[in-house]
Amino acid sequence: MRVILATLAAGALASGAAAQTAEANTRAAIARVERLNPQVNAVLALDPTALDQARAQDRMRRVRGPLFGMPILIKDNIETLGPLPTTAGSLALKDNVTNRDAPLVAGLRAAGAVILGKTNLSEWANIRSNASISGWSAVGGQTRNPYALDRNPCGSSSGSGSAVAAGMVDAAIGSETDGSITCPAALNGVVGLKPTIGLVSRTHIVPISASQDTAGPIARDVTTAARVLGAIAGSDAADPVTAAADAHRTDYLAALRPDALKGVRIGVLRFSAGWSKPVDAVFEQALGILRAQGATLVEITELKDRDKIGAAENIVLMTELKAGLNAYLATAPATVKTRTLADVIAFNTANAPQEMALFGQELFETAEKTKGLDDPAYKAARALSLRLAGKDGIDAMLAANNVVALVGPTMPAAWLIDAVNGDQVSGSGAGNLAAVAGTPHLTVPMGNVRGMPVGLSFMGPAWSEARLLGLGFAYEQARGPLPAPTFRKSVEDSPDVAALLAPAKR
């Protein structure tokens, strides 16, 4: 009931119900954070100006925006106006108070949203080490999955996914380089949309990769994701890759029709499944719903040279990480003493008990050794990864099979939080292609495995967000409601699982 009421409150504000005010909605959201956050550790800090923002919205009721009075949480690698630092989860940035809004945050405010606070994340958006624990940062500690508190929320937008799933807010903003919106959305049983690269500005976001970075909504449902996307999409002169955004931005809500699946052809990425029989079983149920709603499904069993994408992508990410982070840190406030990636590496070494007790920084060290954006090896890797994932990947599969979208399981169900071995993930899911190609990727909850959510991915060509949201909405409506989180300590707390693990009766 709590989750349903939270959603209805935001919907009432959007539709103009006189009984609600932005201040009342914000106070209710603050109360939910204070009550629920101690269990999942998703929210780093509440913005002390949140109630003032809400009161200002109430004074403007005659000119309310489409997100009027909606409290929204922001991942803590995205800058916001006010006193909160933007830390990327690192103690090296604990004093990074820029007192400015990223353009996407300004868009949320202009649409009437209340910036409620900042969410925890995988430190440095999970680009420090291959042995990391998703959802952990030195600033925020470990975020947990509200469906089982010993399970990982994925990352790097861990707090955003966990907070929405827990019912603290209806929407949060995440960022993604490869899986960092869609994975935490899927594992926490909520909707996540990674937009086309260039639809949403990256200005004033702590960077990893100019080729793959973007921000996007994590939301309670597809409708809320569409509303939020409409507020954050748009061109930004400071981010040239967004030059075409205004031309492609559209009314995303208009695409949300219950019959959107009728008569469409959708490709089924069989090569993205097969690593988990329980997930495959849920995936087959989801495919059955798509068929029942009138979609024609086309089997796609392989993608040539898919195994070559990862190595090329790694060269791109390492090279662009050094270039992008050095540029960001060079303009950080004087209170930030780390001005280069090399400085951050030295800081982590000097503060190893706080920063590196659980895992190291070998990816940072690899990035520091790269030779810059003019390096022929980098240029070749970027061209190769874009071709294999884009032109010869997503685009080729869409064209060759005459389909409008591709579907697959997003990720495995959540793994255990493991302070000994780091993340232990059983499969890679469907999303890597869209991340590398720079094309949109929507994940919608499709069911659960032993009570742990799994997501269904919808992917399409560049600028096809409206189409994907429409397909996802039609699927969501046909699928029906799914269980809300119960904040159980472990999957083993469920009687059916406990019975399976108990010794046989003699």
Region spans (language model):
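Glycine-rich, small-residue loops and helix-cap segments
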Residues: 29, 69, 110, 279, ...
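Structural recognition of the beta-strand scaffold that forms the well-ordered cores
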Residues: 42-44, 71-74, 107, 114-118, ...
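Flexible glycine/proline-rich, aromatic-decorated loop/lid segments
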Residues: 137, 181, 188-204, 443
